[in-house]
């Protein structure tokens, strides 16, 4: 039978104890989505689904007001600022807006304003498009920009001043007359749709992460640690509000006059903003801008209505997390029905197999949609990331009629299946167990939803990332052959697998590397010398360089020490791979691998899967044919004062490098860890040791100076 999602309890029938449980569930879920949206710039659900969660939370809190507490999302704004940027306290909180989803809710908002102000007539209202971007506060002192901050949790944001100075729409100096001594001016950072598409194309071509929508790209670009990255992104800014103002630049200030002043001061103000004098005017603007929505060069997700007179705004004040004098009239999520013709599998650069729905073209929100992501096998089967049913547990099949929604108005997703129209012969989709690009086995590890290609060394879809890993510092570490060179050589077809690196010199009569821009005879000669120097390599570096899933530097060293030599390692791996079956592996070789301290089932299975793929073996054999010697692993001693001890190095070491210290400790039988815990035996502290030293003292861990460490290990 098909699993059914347990329906949310009806609010009308909720008892107080059940309401308390439901509120806790909703609060935790909303807080998680707030973090994904405000901190990670990666929302996990559509705006419509998020709004539905909030409306349910608000409805329950209205029924049980005694259950409202200060930590509820209805009493807070956004999410706490991330740790990567300095914190900034907003002089005036940056609150969020209440939402309206229907015309009568807008009318109710205006009536509430009239009642509160005791007005006979509808006050003038400013209507403006609600830009789907990232809120920003700009502080000016004597007309000069001194600080820029994100909204954060509404009270404390992140200092992004250096990045904001690269946005052309943000003036460093305010123009015109009547400039306040101090003012906080606010607006939205966004990205034009065409700029977003161009950026994603560049990201994809460079093998970098692509953004889900313009809002995410704007937020991610603004919150870059490298200001040059932000400067390279086409960010825009609309000004529409303010916080602290030492003085207003005009008598009897109003919202629309302040927007005019912002325009004169050097900001870009949205030209669509309109002054309305009735509810009918406001709703007419909403419908008009909704019709223009698809043709606008930027994304909007609704309309914001604000009482025009600032003295009225001041009298109206605020309720918990939002002002009484403004409301957001949200657009409904745009959906359409179409037929899913085919499910294709794409292979990512890390080997992940991702299903994509090929749809009969359909217009959703003014955009023609032909593809939609299906995420993974579980999503197709109707199972969410938490293991619970989604879409009422209904699976997705080729030939299905489906409802498509543009999440965040950009990413198409399938939200439901029209079961009444499912073809009689539609079969459940069977996820492929082979990579569609290279034909290698695909595996799905326990606890994961993703299938991955095991053709690590030979799959074209993974080639560039695997080659970058192969030449990385902890692997072959070839001087002069970094990521950019790998990308160039792979793009030209010169290096497709690791062995090709070692044949560059022999092929250079045809390749002519010295004719490349930035190269010359000397640099090419140095590159070939560096490559030749790596024809002799340590066993643990070779194992790490293969890019086997879950085999990092530490596990590579464990494997190298256990088997000792390349021949012993390869012999054991081939024996284990030959014995691999769908039911498992009971061979002596596999059991020996699985029993290595620190390895375990997950790593052992990943290693065997790698060696079970014959084309990986061929690529490895081709590489080994180019190498001169693979050095046996240096066996750790067991007769030293630190054998079996866990050691952490922290601070600036003066007598040896961190890598030298680590290698020496491991040779003496110690385990070197990256963090301090109760299991740590020694912390070796150099100059400017920080939090690790503090934690060691708190836990009572023995702390040694460099000299004391050298004395302990016998210098």
UniProtKB/Swiss-Prot annotation:
GO terms for biological process: DNA repair; DNA replication. NAD(+) binds at residues 47-51, 96-97, 128, 151, 188, 306, 330. The active site is at residue 130. SUPFAM superfamilies: BRCT domain, DNA ligase/mRNA capping enzyme, catalytic domain, Nucleic acid-binding proteins, RuvA domain 2-like. It catalyses: NAD(+) + (deoxyribonucleotide)n-3'-hydroxyl + 5'-phospho-(deoxyribonucleotide)m = (deoxyribonucleotide)n+m + AMP + beta-nicotinamide D-nucleotide. It comes from the Bacteria. GO terms for molecular function: DNA ligase (NAD+) activity; metal ion binding. Residues 637-715 form the BRCT domain. Keywords: DNA damage, DNA repair, DNA replication, Ligase, Magnesium, Manganese, Metal-binding, NAD, Zinc. The keyword Iron-sulfur does not apply. One of its GO terms (cellular component) is cytosol. HAMAP family: DNA_ligase_A. Belongs to the NAD-dependent DNA ligase family. LigA subfamily. NCBIfam families: dnlj (TIGR00575), PRK07956.1 (NF005932). This is DNA ligase.
